[in-house]
Amino acid sequence: MAAKVEPFWIRKTLDQLDTQEWESLCDGCGLCCLQKLEDEEDNSVYYTRIACKLLDLKTCQCSDYANRRASVPDCIQLTPGQADEFKWLPPTCGYRLVSEGKDLPLWHHLVCGDRTAVHHERISQSGRMLSEKNVAEDDWEDYLIFRAG
């Protein structure tokens, strides 16, 4: 009987992942591309339903991923070196889970082989987001959906 081979996200640390493995940890939920607000009193971070202007509201994919930082200078670029800062990411995020030494959920495309499972399981905000192009920044507080952490 052949030995079981552990998936790369179990047997490697974040620093050991190659670019393709790193990028594949993204489940495509789009939550990191939602606008967030920080409470000035306790520094809590709150997610809103307001999506980056480049995010496709249905597929939860960036419409210009390769060049996103040119049009959105404050776009978040996750790297393995930031793992200790991943607490603001949703608890379902592949990057956060692997950084915490946890396995990926059953609906993650690397586990189930289906990139649309994140939408079928309603982990993503597909169909529930609004583009930042259509909501005044002063109104973002009206669209809070959850607290990070």
Swiss-Prot record:
InterPro entries linked to this entry: Puta_zinc/iron-chelating_dom, UCP006173
Pfam families found in the cross-reference section: CxxCxxCC (PF03692)
Entry superkingdom: Bacteria
PANTHER family: UPF0260 PROTEIN YCGN
Family of the protein in this entry: Belongs to the UPF0260 family.
Protein name (Swiss-Prot/TrEMBL): UPF0260 protein PSPTO_3918
Native source organism of the sequence: Pseudomonas syringae pv. tomato (strain ATCC BAA-871 / DC3000)
